[in-house]
């Protein structure tokens, strides 16, 4: 009743004054109304569904139906859905464990024995060998034989290297024994430097050596600071001076 009284007063005041209330006044009145009533009341305007006594809805809802606006496309889609089949993008590969789990133990043992007994087929291929300046070609040569050849070649090279090393060491030892020690040679075999005498030289060589010595003597005397006599004249007339000396003519000359 109080709310109806307030509403009537509010309407009457608007009629008498002719002025609109302010926003603050409306807010204050709305807050007072909420404090008194606690809620806005029934604002559903009769659109809410009222439940029956048994707990079921009063107005039972009918099931909704979809309308196909594009019937042609719908039929195509249905056919496509029917045709689609699930594809296994990652197929599970059968493993030995899965097969062995399903098989009995005897079959599993047989399978393992057969797999062990089966040997890989020997593959053949052409083979070329270069040895001692020759080229040897085999058209069909198995891998096992090739391995044997390689092993033999490796053993042969190892043996040849060992022999070469032993030969080199023996040669070095013999050379070291042949070379004399320098200290022993100096003491045992003194150096004998004997100059060859002039008598052993041939006559022609000895005459040329005398001429060379005479010329050298003349050059030495000519380069002296002063000369007592002309060496050319002295060498040309030695006998005349000796013969004339006893006659007392040496002073005049």
From Swiss-Prot:
Subcellular compartments: Nucleus; Cell membrane
Positions of disulphide bridges: none
Binding site for jasmonate: 204
This protein's record includes keyword Zinc: no
Mod. after translation: (Microbial infection) Acetylated by Pseudomonas syringae HopZ1a.
GO BP annotation list: defense response to bacterium; flower development; jasmonic acid mediated signaling pathway; pollen development; regulation of cellular response to alkaline pH; response to jasmonic acid
Induction field: Up-regulated by jasmonate, wounding and herbivory.
InterPro entries with a match to the protein in the record: CCT_CS, TIFY/JAZ, Tify_dom
Outcome after substituting residue 206 to A: Loss of binding to COI1but no effect on MYC2 binding
Motif (Jas): 202-227
Keywords from the UniProt entry: Acetylation, Cell membrane, Host-virus interaction, Jasmonic acid signaling pathway, Membrane, Nucleus, Plant defense, Transcription, Transcription regulation, Ubl conjugation
Location of the Tify domain: 120-155
Expressed in which tissues: Srtongly expressed in root tips.
SMART domains: TIFY
Oligomeric form and interacting partners: Homo- and heterodimer. Interacts with TIFY10B/JAZ2, TIFY6B/JAZ3, TIFY6A/JAZ4, TIFY11A/JAZ5, TIFY11B/JAZ6, TIFY5A/JAZ8, TIFY7/JAZ9, TIFY9/JAZ10, TIFY3A/JAZ11 and TIFY3B/JAZ12. Interacts with COI1, MYC2, MYC3, MYC4, MYB21 and MYB24. Interacts (via tify domain) with AFPH2/NINJA. (Microbial infection) Interacts with the pathogenic Pseudomonas syringae HopZ1a protein.
Free-text comment on this protein's domains from its UniProt entry: The jas domain (202-227) is necessary and sufficient for interaction with COI1 and is required for TIFY 10A/JAI1 instability in response to jasmonate. The jas domain (202-227) is required for interaction with Pseudomonas syringae HopZ1a.
Function: Repressor of jasmonate responses. Jasmonoyl-isoleucine (JA-Ile) specifically promotes COI1-TIFY10A/JAZ1 interaction. Interacts with COI1 and inositol pentakisphosphate to form a high-affinity jasmonates coreceptor.
Protein family (similarity comment): Belongs to the TIFY/JAZ family.
PANTHER family the UniProt entry points to: PROTEIN TIFY 10A (PTHR33077:SF154), PROTEIN TIFY 4A-RELATED-RELATED (PTHR33077)
Protein name (database record): Protein TIFY 10A
